[in-house]
Amino acid sequence: MSVSVAFEKARAEGRGVLVGYLPAGFPSVDGGIDAIRAMVDAGVDVVEVGFPYSDPVIDGPVIQRASEAALAAGVRAVDVLRTVEAVAAGGTPTLLMTYWNPVERYGVEAFARDLAAAGGAGLITPDLIPDEADEWLAASDAYGLDRVFLVAPSSTDHRLAATAEACRGFVYATSVMGVTGARDRTSAAAPALVERVRQATSTPVAVGLGVRNGEQAAEVASFADGVIVGSALVGCLLDGDGLPALRALTAELAAGVRS
């Protein structure tokens, strides 16, 4: 199921989309599936499943810790795809967030085939740019998958337009420079970046990197189509509070995008 369904539904309801990230295989494969399901039950509209990777260039310390734990426990591509399948079976659009190396190792066409077979909506590829994505563009077209690329405040107008044009599902706007992580204040650069993207495409724009509470989610949803939350949600599992804390934070964020 394409994530566009979630954006259309939210737009009809006059609210933002809540995109929630958790890595596959943390705290275990089954435990990770349970956590994502809890997040969905508490109000996440689109799930972003992380593919743990050993060299995560934009992941902040919280997501790195969870990914390292998953890798140490032996999580593999088959486990990641099983996670996607289990979550997508519930009817929630489910994207996979992955660095490009694991997809290349698996085989781009084969990965697209198996992701589609698992019910996955598509990929978010933080270290792949459209200029270097010919194989993925073809495979995503062949299997009807969404493809989400990232834009940043530093993106030139030409790069931003080309990236937005290549996206399907939504455009991922990184609201701050640097690695991921919850922050006390959302970036002042985010509204201007969203406006630049909207001048280039009619595809929805979701903002990630930094949101940690309902108030910030409401702020971002006031100018963007979607709010992406990762580190704050992963932190609920890392800090030992577990599913109750995850449910509570997700419900707060879901209320924020609806306010």
Identify the meaning behind each predicted range.
Residues 72-75, 119-132, 146-155, 160-161, ...:
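Catalytic beta/alpha-barrel core
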Residues 195-203, 212-259:
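Alpha/beta catalytic cores of nucleotide-metabolism and tRNA/nucleoside-modifying enzymes
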Residues 44-56, 118-124, 129, 171-181, ...:
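Glycine-rich phosphate-binding active-site loops on the catalytic face of alpha/beta enzymes
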Residues 29-39, 155-165, 200, 207, ...:
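Catalytic cores of alpha/beta
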Residues 1-21, 84-88:
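N-terminal amphipathic alpha-helix/helix-capping segment at the start of soluble metabolic enzymes
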Residues 35, 40, 46, 51, ...:
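Active-site beta->alpha loop and helix N-cap motifs at the rims of alpha/beta catalytic domains
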Residues 60-95, 138-152, 188-205, 246-259:
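Alpha-helix-loop-beta-strand connector modules within alpha/beta enzyme cores
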Residues 63, 71, 150, 160-199, ...:
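Glycine/Thr-rich beta-alpha phosphate-binding loop at enzyme active sites
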